[in-house]
From Swiss-Prot:
InterPro entries: DNA-dir_RNA_pol_bsu_ext_1_sf, DNA-dir_RNA_pol_bsu_external_1, DNA-dir_RNA_pol_su2, DNA-dir_RNAP_su2_dom, DNA-dir_RNAP_su2_hyb_sf, RNA_pol_bsu_bac, RNA_pol_bsu_CS, RNA_pol_bsu_protrusion. GO terms for biological process: DNA-templated transcription. GO terms for molecular function: DNA binding; DNA-directed RNA polymerase activity; ribonucleoside binding. It is an enzyme of class 2 (transferase). Residues 1132-1159 are annotated as: Disordered. Keywords: DNA-directed RNA polymerase, Nucleotidyltransferase, Transcription, Transferase. Belongs to the RNA polymerase beta chain family. One of its GO terms (cellular component) is DNA-directed RNA polymerase complex. This is DNA-directed RNA polymerase subunit beta. PROSITE patterns: RNA_POL_BETA (PS01166). It comes from Cutibacterium acnes (strain DSM 16379 / KPA171202).
Length: 1159
């Protein structure tokens, strides 16, 4: 199972790619693997392309046997072949699948709302078994969605990700549970296939061995063995040493022969059906021994062989009698308390119950396998169609094409990509969000757990997660622990188990040979930590080494007993967690928030890489594909905003096209900027262009800001943040957001809709920005209610007046009755039109049925930071901006530099995320630089050894997770930082400075911690949340305003608020709120009229909710009458319609909408 490779050393303190200065002390023999391999390699295996084939050939050349030599599609076509008719006179088989080129490129598919797919063809052979005649044909199976180079799929124009699923592996499992009625333990064994019926053995409190077939009624195991053809003597010969089997055999009264046993089993499995020996034999055969009905899969066979000590071939994917016998032996040994089962010439079998949450028993279904399973479903449906057609068609006229109906296959694929819980709309907030989404592991989904039934155990961190699944990064809320993230160095093997790399240790000497181990292999070894001290020869420096042994227990052992050592201190965490500097100083729950909030950071207009990073920034940005890298070495010929031309050394020319202002799935802006100049020399892998949230090829989610930890006038109470006006005016935290607005012109029953500039009852001012076709011009500034696309819809014919009839008789044309259904800017939005796309059936564009024309308008909005926006650091330290102070009012340093941001110091101690304080100090050190030529102490000696002696200002530092800058180094470097031009040190050796109050110029009484912190602007922007309504839509039944910004709803004045009004005795205000401001329908129309005309507000009437209550009571056969003060009955049917039509007022309209009332 284990794969090895020898790695090269990399001991430089300055990264050759990003130029970061690293404080790492531990030599890592292995680079982080490509972070998208989880997705890309799995899909390559499925389609069996050249990349996959070359990897297989290389692995076979190395002599490895743990790899798949068949592609996923090849496996599935072999599995279904041959399809035979019921009389087995003819068969259909498939081989040699191939793809043709996709119809459209990735960009065209996004533009046209189509799926990026390639036509899949397969050679189908029809064989007449009687004449042995073969007809061969190439058959089209359907359009097969392809994965883009970034590991995503384009489905109907949107980018989607298929998430890998964590499921229980097929195999054999032994469990020990306490009996509720007695103090005995009950031992069970479950044989779980990939598909097919379960087989369960159990030893109950009476010490009898029972078996359960396909979760039906329990029966004695000896009956099952007899049904398989065993005699009582043979059972005693094989299992005579087990008392429980002998007891069970004694209880088998009346079941002696195989026939009796089969009938007995059939009665329990199919009660009510007449039993027969053949039917029983067939049923048992289909349950466990028919490859069409039962499949352990290779992984199931591998697990059973491993657990029970068998050596059956991997292609034996149904149960065998050997499996059943070995499982019974094992469960009996477990019941008897036997520790090991000896085997001749091989390792002994350890007898112990299984831990279902162990990663040796949970495997990943990656993209390829998930699609393969879906294809299997589609092909099995197609198989039924083929069989039916074989029986109905003339055998002479049959060709493969006439037998095959591809609809079930294409429907299965479409259903999976469109509606499956595991095919998700890609989180595209920033490159890290994309990366994390592609590396996500979900225990939910079809065949997995459901969040309601998942208990604590399955959600908890398990020792076997080490190096495989991140213990930190998981969502907060109901999915906690069910959704995880793949660890940085982990990979998935051919069986779907997650492997993690270790350095091999031979007699206390740590080699650079890297071995990948699965969780159950790792359990057998003694493993040292990555930070175990080594001498110059690579031997352990200490005689006893801290290690972890079986079940993750820590212990100290002699160095000669160590088998392996971790390759890196960060191998246990995911990419997002590995981006948090000083993670080791943060509390786990805050680190979780920090990892999750980095994914919510919005790409900024001006990006800046962090002063204090972890060294993972470059790999993350490059692997996700947002940074354009040079594919060949050469020199730059020309550079423009959207094209880079390179003359390559091999005499060829390459052009790189850059993305410009494209909308992401999250509504953020994807824009690339060139990094190279004309004439510049580039090597392979040189970053040519930055993408969103990247800076010189490094991930840059936020900005470095000069932070002070101090209270300020109570404005940073409860984590609120005070910001300097400079951040607003210099566009430090400004982002661009792009909204897409779409309208289509359809055929209606009354005629076709039309996109036009000629809109009834609209002033010329409103049409100023529209072109002659009624579509807004690019560059126009638009606000709420402005028309983007003019559209009219035909109205129903109305009764004509005599005058109109006369005009029509003279001019001979129909009066044009249309209503305005134009696309308008929704409420609360504004911006600049940056793009218009027009699709028309006349130009050959494919549109939905009944749609003649579709127009898409892109509106970009520049959002400066404002009060109410949410900011966060990388340590789970989040807050909302409460005040933006003028620069002159901000506290300033002794040299006059005002700070950018004021944070509350009380946000640190109770949250236990001290990493932010260390980041702030190291940020100041990075900003000011240092010179430790004269410094003394071990810390200075170590930094001098790696060449970090005189570092300039504004340097970028890396402090890797669990191997970063120490407290001694930070306090030492604060002492030896470069002074200002005046020769003074602004920040003392304790990291604090004397700050002055910007309003008075007086120094604050205490010194304040000051330094540079990396702050992120999160997607929770106040512009998306703030909302107000004057008039708007009402609910159909209650006639009360709708709720929520999306429905343009009102603010609910709830039960408790009514109590508050009652408490204050504000009777008139309360009456207004409960009637005319809510659901007194005629009243609110009259009030609107009174306000317009400047009259007094009329008396409120009866609210609609009261009428609904009366109706409810009438439905219970209670005749409720409402009387006025004179005792006369009030008619509740009201005159709301009369009032509305009389006044010509409709206050139920939504601004910018054409619907009169919403439900």
């Amino acid at each position: 199972m284990a794969a090895t490779r020898t790695a090269s050393k990399n001991t430089s303190a300055i990264s050759p790619q990003s130029g970061r200065i690293s404080f790492a002390k531990i030599h890592e023999p292995l680079e982080v693997p490509n972070l998208l391999d989880l997705q890309v390699e799995s899909f390559n295996w499925l389609v069996g392309n050249e990349i996959w084939q070359s990897r297989v050939d290389a692995a076979l050349a190395e002599g490895r046997t743990d790899i798949n030599t068949k592609s996923g599609l090849e496996e599935i076509f072999e599995e279904i072949s041959p399809i035979e008719d019921y009389s087995q006179t003819m068969s259909l088989s498939f081989r040699d699948h191939r793809f043709e080129d996709p119809k459209h490129s990735v960009d065209e598919c996004k533009d046209r709302d189509t799926t990026y797919a390639a036509p899949l063809f397969v050679t189908a052979e029809f064989m007449n078994n009687e004449t042995e005649e073969i007809k061969s044909q190439t058959v089209f199976i359907g359009d097969f969605p392809l994965m883009t180079s970034k590991g995503t799929f384009i489905i109907n124009g949107t980018e989607r990700v298929v998430v890998s699923q964590l499921v229980r592996s097929p195999g054999v499992y032994f469990e020990k549970t306490a009996d509720k009625t007695s103090d005995k333990d009950i031992f069970t064994c479950k044989v779980i296939p990939s598909r097919g019926a379960w087989l369960e053995f159990a030893i109950d409190k009476r010490d009898t061995v029972g078996v359960r077939l396909d979760r039906k009624r329990k029966q004695n195991v000896t009956v099952f063995l007899k049904a398989l053809g065993w005699t009582a003597d043979r059972i005693l010969e094989e299992f005579g040493t087990h008392e429980s089997i002998r007891q069970t055999l004694e209880k088998d009264h009346g079941v002696e022969t195989q026939d009796q046993a089969l009938l007995d089993i059939y009665k329990k499995l199919r009660p009510g059906e007449p039993p027969s020996r053949d039917a029983a034999q067939q049923l048992l055969e289909n349950y466990y021994f028919n490859p069409k009905r039962y499949d352990l899969a290779k992984v199931g066979r591998y697990k059973i062989n491993k657990k029970l000590g068998l050596s059956l071939p991997f292609d034996q994917q149904v149960l065998t009698v050997d499996d059943i016998v070995a499982a019974i032996h094992f469960v009996c040994a477990l019941h008897e308390g036997t520790a090991i089962l000896p085997r001749e010439g091989q390792d002994d079998i350890v007898v112990e119950p299984d831990d279902i949450d162990h990663f040796g028993n949970r495997r990943l279904r990656t993209v390829g396998e998930l699609i393969q399973n879906q294809l299997r479903t589609g092909l099995s449906r197609m198989e039924r169609v083929v069989r039916d057609r074989m029986t109905t068609q003339d055998i002479e006229a049959i060709t493969p094409q006439t037998l095959i109906n591809i609809r079930p296959v294409t429907a299965a694929i479409k259903e999976f990509f469109g509606t499956s819980q595991l095919s998700q709309f890609m989180d595209q907030n920033n490159p890290l969000a994309e990366m994390t989404h592609k590396r996500r592991l979900s225990a939910l989904g079809p065949g997995g757990l459901s969040r309601d039934r998942a208990g604590m155990e399955v959600r908890d961190v398990h020792p076997s997660h080490y190096g495989r699944m991140c213990p930190i990064e998981t969502p907060e809320g109901p999915n906690i622990g069910l959704i995880g993230s793949l660890a940085s160095f982990a990979r998935v093997n051919a069986f779907g188990f997650i492997e993690t790399p270790y350095r091999k240790v031979v007699d206390g000497h740590v080699t650079d040979e890297v071995v990948y181990l699965t969780a159950d292999e790792e359990d057998r070894h003694v493993i040292a930590q990555a930070n175990a001290k080594l001498d110059d020869d690579g031997h352990f420096a200490n005689d006893r080494v801290l290690v972890r042994q079986r079940h993750g227990e820590a212990d100290e052992v002699p160095s000669s007993e160590v088998d392996y050592m971790d390759v890196s201190p960060r191998q246990m965490v995911s990419v997002a967690s590995a981006l948090i500097p000083f993670l080791e100083h943060d509390d786990a729950s805050r680190a979780l928030m920090g990892a999750n909030m980095q994914r919510q950071a919005v790409p900024l207009v001006r990006t800046e890489a962090p002063f204090v990073g972890t060294g993972m920034e470059y790999r993350c940005a490059v692997d996700v594909g947002d940074v354009t890298l040079a594919e060949k070495a050469g020199s730059v010929l020309s550079v423009s905003a959207d094209l880079i031309d390179i003359a390559c050394d091999d005499g060829t020319y390459q052009t790189y096209k850059l993305e410009k202002f494209r909308r992401s799935n999250a509504g953020t802006c994807i824009n690339q900027r060139p990094l190279v100049k004309v004439g510049q020399r580039v090597e392979v892998g040189t970053p040519l262009a930055d993408g969103p949230s990247t800076d010189n090829g490094e991930l840059a989610l936020g900005r470095n800001m000069l932070a002070a930890f101090m209270p300020w006038q109570g404005l940073n109470y409860e984590d609120a943040i005070i910001l300097s006006q400079r951040i607003v005016s210099d566009d430090v935290l400004t982002s661009i957001h792009i909204e897409e607005h779409e309208v289509d012109a359809r055929d209606t029953k009354l005629g076709a809709e039309e996109i036009t500039r000629d809109i009834p009852n609209v002033s010329e001012d409103m049409l100023a920005n529209l072109d002659e076709n009624g579509i807004v011009r690019i560059g126009a500034e638009v606000g709420t209610g402005d028309i983007l696309v003019g559209k009219v819809t035909p109205k129903g014919e109305t009764e004509l007046t005599p005058e109109e009839r006369l005009l029509r008789a003279i001019f001979g044309e129909k009066a044009r009755e249309v209503r305005d259904t134009s696309l308008k800017v929704p409420h609360g939005e504004e911006g600049t039109v940056i793009g218009v796309r027009i699709f028309d059936t006349e130009n050959g564009d494919e549109l939905a049925p009944g749609v003649n024309q579709m127009v898409r308008v892109y509106v970009a909005q520049k959002r400066k930071i404002s009060i109410g926006d949410k900011l966060a650091g990388r340590h789970g330290n989040k807050g909302v901006i409460s005040k933006i102070l003028p620069v002159e009012d901000m506290p300033f340093l002794p040299d006059g530099t005002p700070v950018d941001i004021i944070l509350n110091p009380l946000g640190v101690p109770s949250r236990m995320n001290v990493g932010q304080v260390l980041e702030m100090h190291l940020g100041w050190i990075a900003h000011s630089g240092w010179d430790i030529t004269q410094a003394e102490g071990d810390w200075a000696e170590r930094l001098r050894e790696v060449g970090l002696i005189d570092i300039p200002e504004e340097s970028r530092l890396a402090t890797p997770v669990f191997d970063g800058a120490t407290e001694q180094e930070i306090t030492g470097l604060l002492q030896y930082g470069h002074p200002t031009r005046d020769g003074e040190m602004l920040v003392d050796t304790d990291g604090k400075a004397t700050l002055f109050d910007g309003r008075t110029g007086e120094p604050f009484p205490s010194k304040v911690g000051v330094g540079y912190m990396y702050m992120l602007k999160l997607h929770h922007l106040v512009d998306d949340k703030i909302h107000a309504r004057s008039t708007g839509p009402y609910s159909m039944i209650t006639q009360q305003p709708l709720g929520g910004k999306a429905q343009f709803g009102g603010q609910r004045f709830g039960e408790m608020e009514v109590w508050a009004m009652e408490a204050y005795g504000a009777a008139w205000a309360l009456q207004e709120l409960l009637t005319i401001k809510s659901d007194d329908v005629p009243g609110r129309v009259k009030v609107y009229e009174a306000i317009v005309k400047g009259e007094n507000i009329p008396e409120p009437g009866i609210p609609e909710s009261f009428k609904v209550l009366v109706k409810e009571m009438k439905s219970l056969c209670l005749n409720v009458e409402v009387l006025n003060s004179e005792g006369q009955e009030i008619d509740l049917r009201g005159s709301e319609e009369d009032t509305r039509s009389g006044l010509g007022i409709d206050i139920g309209r939504r601004p910018g909408a054409d619907n009169a009332m919403a439900d």
